[in-house]
């Protein structure tokens, strides 16, 4: 084992005052020669995603001690995307990714910690922790709080998206208010992150593929015993990694990020993975850009039938073999790199050695590579005169991802949702929600409420929705987000007028408004930059420093 970083606060006569403080929190003489390991605990009762984390943190703490380390627990924040969705509060969601990253980096570096075990549940916990881990490059491991089990109503599996869609179903007369309340009361049965292949489960899978969490751990249910056992094992592995000096940037290679992109395509993951992978890779100093997603999408099929557009939930994926089974199928097809290593020092080829070559025959969640749901990945990168830097379209569940129609312009999510619920949106429309980007929102809110209402009204195949904001992992339909440049910085999405014809063509990777360059230039001359909405506080700071979404909406370029 190399010299411990914590020796800066534990060794030598001059560090006697430092040691006195450590003795007060439980250190004894022999402990000053042990690695000090931060336990970044995202426990919170704000959200079901994080309410089960404390037991995992305590289990990990015990395991660190038993394995020869000294744990020091500290808290990180979380917000609940599901609770803040559709409100002003959602502007703080993406901002919280940076706060989480900054807080973990601050605590670990201020206290000269030798390693960190991060525990998270809700969407931004995972990328926030990974950004911090990449910045510090000290031995690290991530423990995912686990997925929620599906709710049940009359034999049907429910998720939180069921409740969002029920709102649209109610306003279009498809269900009664009584049914809406039944869905509301039954869709979230306990602890864990939203149960489909939404953002939290997508990002936990990304971390598993990158090698910074244990195999199979990203799809475990939050309330199952194996999740606690996995936390115990993760802590033990981290202590070993410190002794072996295995560091995050040893694992976060370009090949590893390509593997992660391949897996999110195969499992039908969230559009948010594009934003977060770009941010993590940027921090790690790895050259991954938005075009890599399109390149990989062209060759990797969707082989998992998972919600929101599919049938099954993440616990079903776990029973079918989890992420290792998906990876083994992709490895055999030559679609991922087998020489990338994980936190245990094993290559992908090594730790997948005992995974079956084909998915189990008694399940329908994971398909064979030759019988995919879709022959190409579902996250398409679209460019054109509305998105010269790129945009992200999610096209799973859409039979024909091509639509040309008149623009219906909204300057906020709230105005759009009101119009949808008033049945003002018709088949063939292209709904435009702008000034919701990283700078303009600020915070790049997720448009789950409008998209779910559209689907609930039966228009998911007949209407396109485009925005410089984001989408929840629970969104599906013909949707295009992350449009860059965004409206607030003068992107062409700011120049569209009501009724302009817009084409969304995921087959040709095209998004454009039917206007000449001359007309766009003329409109740009008349464009007035919006007044900054916030003068003080975190949203004001964020809007001044955040990058474009095509670079991951990072704050430390």
From Swiss-Prot:
Membrane keyword on record: no
Biological process, per Gene Ontology: isoleucine biosynthetic process; L-valine biosynthetic process
UniProt modified residues of type N6-carboxylysine: 124
This protein's encoding gene: ilvD
Enzymatic reactions: (2R)-2,3-dihydroxy-3-methylbutanoate = 3-methyl-2-oxobutanoate + H2O; (2R,3R)-2,3-dihydroxy-3-methylpentanoate = (S)-3-methyl-2-oxopentanoate + H2O
Signal peptide: none
Binding residues for [2Fe-2S] cluster: 49, 122, 194
Enzyme class: lyase
Keyword DNA-binding in annotation: no
One MF term in the entry's GO annotations: dihydroxy-acid dehydratase activity
Subunit-level organization: Homodimer.
InterPro entries: DHAD_IlvD/Edd, Dihydro-acid_dehy_C, DihydroxyA_deHydtase, DiOHA_6PGluconate_deHydtase_CS, ILV_EDD_C, ILV_EDD_N, IlvD/EDD_N
Residues annotated as catalytic: 472
EC number: 4.2.1.9
Assigned protein family: Belongs to the IlvD/Edd family.
Chain's role: Functions in the biosynthesis of branched-chain amino acids. Catalyzes the dehydration of (2R,3R)-2,3-dihydroxy-3-methylpentanoate (2,3-dihydroxy-3-methylvalerate) into 2-oxo-3-methylpentanoate (2-oxo-3-methylvalerate) and of (2R)-2,3-dihydroxy-3-methylbutanoate (2,3-dihydroxyisovalerate) into 2-oxo-3-methylbutanoate (2-oxoisovalerate), the penultimate precursor to L-isoleucine and L-valine, respectively.
Disulphide bonds in the chain: none
Pathway annotation: Amino-acid biosynthesis; L-isoleucine biosynthesis; L-isoleucine from 2-oxobutanoate: step 3/4; Amino-acid biosynthesis; L-valine biosynthesis; L-valine from pyruvate: step 3/4
Keyword terms of this UniProt record: 2Fe-2S, Amino-acid biosynthesis, Branched-chain amino acid biosynthesis, Iron, Iron-sulfur, Lyase, Magnesium, Metal-binding
Cofactor: binding details: Binds 1 [2Fe-2S] cluster per subunit. This cluster acts as a Lewis acid cofactor.
Cofactor: [2Fe-2S] cluster; Mg(2+)
Protein name, as recorded: Dihydroxy-acid dehydratase
């Amino acid at each position: 084992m190399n010299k411990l970083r914590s020796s800066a606060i534990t060794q030598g006569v001059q560090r006697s005052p430092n040691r006195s403080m450590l003795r007060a929190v439980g250190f004894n003489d022999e402990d000053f020669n042990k690695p000090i390991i931060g336990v970044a605990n995202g426990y919170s009762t704000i959200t079901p995603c994080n309410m089960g984390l404390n037991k995992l943190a305590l289990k990990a703490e015990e395991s660190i001690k038993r394995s020869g380390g000294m744990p020091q627990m500290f808290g990180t924040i979380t917000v609940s995307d599901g609770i803040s969705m559709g409100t002003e509060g959602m502007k703080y969601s993406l901002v919280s990714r940076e706060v989480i990253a900054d807080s973990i980096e601050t605590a670990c570096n201020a206290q000269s910690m030798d390693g960190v075990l991060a525990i998270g549940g809700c969407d931004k916990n995972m990328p926030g922790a990974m950004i911090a881990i990449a910045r510090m490059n000290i031995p690290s491991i991530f423990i995912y709080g686990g997925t929620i089990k599906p709710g049940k109503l009359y034999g049907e599996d429910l998720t939180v998206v069921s409740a969002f869609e029920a709102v649209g179903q109610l306003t279009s007369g498809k269900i009664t208010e009584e049914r809406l309340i039944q869905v509301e009361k039954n869709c979230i049965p306990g602890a864990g992150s939203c149960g489909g292949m939404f953002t939290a489960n997508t990002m936990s899978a990304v971390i598993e593929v990158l090698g910074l969490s244990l195999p199979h751990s990203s799809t475990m249910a939050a309330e199952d015993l194996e999740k606690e056992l996995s936390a115990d094992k993760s802590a033990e592995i981290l202590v070993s990694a410190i002794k072996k000096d295995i560091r995050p940037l040893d694992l976060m290679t370009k090949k590893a990020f390509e593997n992660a992109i391949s897996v999110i395509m195969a499992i039908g993951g969230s559009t948010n993975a594009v934003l977060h992978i770009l941010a993590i890779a940027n921090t790690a100093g790895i050259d991954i850009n938005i075009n890599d997603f399109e390149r990989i999408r062209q060759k990797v099929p969707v082989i998992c039938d998972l919600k929101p557009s599919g049938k099954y939930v993440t616990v079903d994926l776990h029973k079918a073999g989890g992420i290792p089974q998906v990876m083994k199928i992709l490895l055999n097809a030559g679609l991922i790199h087998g020489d990338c290593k994980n936190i245990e020092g094993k290559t992908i080829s090594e730790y997948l050695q005992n995974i079956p070559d084909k998915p189990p025959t008694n399940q329908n969640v994971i398909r064979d590579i030759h019988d995919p749901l879709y022959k190409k990945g579902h996250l398409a990168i679209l460019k054109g005169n509305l998105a010269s830097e790129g945009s992200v379209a999610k096209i799973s569940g859409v039979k024909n991802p091509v639509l040309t129609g008149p623009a219906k312009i909204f300057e906020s999510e709230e105005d759009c949702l009101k119009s949808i619920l008033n049945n003002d949106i018709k088949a063939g429309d292209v709904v435009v929600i702008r000034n919701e980007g990283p700078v303009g929102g600020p915070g790049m809110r997720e448009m789950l409420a409008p998209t779910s209402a559209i689907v609930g009204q039966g228009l998911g195949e007949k209407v396109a929705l485009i925005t410089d904001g984001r989408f929840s992992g629970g969104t599906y339909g013909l949707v295009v987000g992350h449009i860059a440049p965004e409206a607030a910085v003068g992107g062409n999405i700011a120049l569209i007028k009501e009724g302009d014809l817009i084409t969304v063509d995921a087959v040709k990777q095209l998004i454009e408004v039917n206007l000449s360059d001359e007309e766009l230039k003329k409109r740009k001359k008349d464009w007035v930059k919006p007044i900054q909405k916030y003068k003080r506080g975190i949203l004001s700071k964020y809007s001044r420093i955040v990058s474009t979404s095509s670079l991951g909406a990072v704050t430390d370029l």
